[in-house]
């Protein structure tokens, strides 16, 4: 037994997760009635979601309270990369929709409990209100905009505190980080359970009716991950970006794919940034911020499904309108984390550009929920892995400028 344990300890986490995925698929196909097994996945995701707000608050307040005057954090470049990457993803989705026009079979059931925002202004109003949320409520409800804003305020206030107080804050951040390490080490079991639940509840063939839509969505996201993002990286760093890109996809995207939660993946991303050797002053802020505004995958979902609706209803569209759609989708996607239902519930905002009624737009949302098992997984994997990628290339660019 000890030999098996020692062998398991020596195997890398990624290989363990791969083994968990294979076992989860086999159990989902061969023994779908083991419904009690799904609780392990819920516990794993619940643990990550529970610790993530505390981790963000502890790390951000600690980083800012210890920050020396004039120290570079590269946040301006990172935010520009987040916004540009989201817009580029939206533009790629428009081009994909032109090359592979989709039509949808509507009259799908719609979740009437969810209501879409009435426009981009409402999305941003919601985000601004989240900035001034009660700090305890922000932590309890995982409102990362609120957690970030209060962590920054507390960090600034703690700059004037004694060294003993700052040391206490640093210890709290280190303890929280250690708890995260323990939870992440349970990823193989948690992901095995999540894969089992997906296969046992949905089957492997349930999405065949929407195969082309899934292919377009996933293909666009893969193109952005393997072509567009590396192109952005090489323009900034002047180095081969693929070792970093593939590492981000492997160590961040893989976990995000199965948890389907950017919030749950924040601890994973922070640990990856630490392993890469990035500055904690930077990534403790950029990673939770990226989970909120870096939404390339969401922009792709909004544009692909909106243009599918446009083609379904035979509405003509010119290039300038498509460009405007990309801007609206990018801006809306940046607020996706502040909307119940995420990117899918922002589709009516984009559809309104073409005069598509809210009732019809919500039917398109219904199609999105049907393919959500795949769409949401790929979207989260792209969004979350890009947070680490853009943080890393911004820091790389800073050190190159400094050496020059």
Curated annotation (Swiss-Prot):
Quickly give the catalysed reaction. Answer: L-serine(in) + Na(+)(in) = L-serine(out) + Na(+)(out); L-threonine(in) + Na(+)(in) = L-threonine(out) + Na(+)(out)
Give the location in the cell. Answer: Cell membrane
SUPFAM superfamilies in alphabetical order: Proton glutamate symport protein (SSF118215)
Record GO biological process: serine transport; threonine transport
One GO MF term = amino acid transmembrane transporter activity
Any one Gene Ontology cellular component term annotated for this protein: plasma membrane
Q: Which residues cross the membrane?
A: 17-37, 39-59, 75-95, 138-158, 179-199, 212-232, 287-307, 313-333
| Keywords, alphabetical | Amino-acid transport, Cell membrane, Membrane, Symport, Transmembrane, Transmembrane helix, Transport
**InterPro entries listed in its UniProt record:** Na-dicarboxylate_symporter, Na:dicarbo_symporter_sf, Ser_Thr_transp_SstT
How does this protein lie in the membrane? Multi-pass membrane protein
Function description: Involved in the import of serine and threonine into the cell, with the concomitant import of sodium (symport system).
Q: Which family does it belong to?
A: Belongs to the dicarboxylate/amino acid:cation symporter (DAACS) (TC 2.A.23) family.
Protein name as catalogued: Serine/threonine transporter SstT
- Name the species this protein comes from: Streptococcus pyogenes serotype M3 (strain ATCC BAA-595 / MGAS315)
Name of the gene: sstT
